Amino acid sequence: MAKNLVPSDAKLEITQIKGVIGVKQNQRETLRSLGLKRIGHTVVRSADAVTVGMLNTVPHLVNVEEAK
């Protein structure tokens, strides 16, 4: 889960772990803005302030790890 994230120069691997049925519209839009389309889909994004803010909106729907 995405907790205690702070903006940095690191790359983050973001994986959607839950579906969007029954989820608020702004959370659906946040997932689409992150580039996530389905459960199990993974994207790599930089850990800038915008991305960290989006991840703080949907921490229960995504799994975040530092990219290798």
From Swiss-Prot:
Domain of life: Bacteria
Signal sequence interval, chain numbering: none
Zinc is among the record's keywords: no
MF terms in GO: structural constituent of ribosome
Cellular component terms per the entry's GO annotation: cytosolic large ribosomal subunit
Keywords: Ribonucleoprotein, Ribosomal protein
GO biological process: translation
InterPro entries: Ribo_uL30_ferredoxin-like_sf (IPR036919), Ribosomal_uL30_bac-type (IPR005996), Ribosomal_uL30_CS (IPR018038), Ribosomal_uL30_ferredoxin-like (IPR016082)
Gene3D superfamilies: Ribosomal protein L30, ferredoxin-like fold domain (3.30.1390.20)
Binding partners and assembly: Part of the 50S ribosomal subunit.
Family membership: Belongs to the universal ribosomal protein uL30 family.
Name of the protein: Large ribosomal subunit protein uL30
UniProt source species: Pseudarthrobacter chlorophenolicus (strain ATCC 700700 / DSM 12829 / CIP 107037 / JCM 12360 / KCTC 9906 / NCIMB 13794 / A6) (Arthrobacter chlorophenolicus)
Organism placement in taxonomy: Bacteria, Bacillati, Actinomycetota, Actinomycetes, Micrococcales
Gene symbol of the encoding locus: rpmD
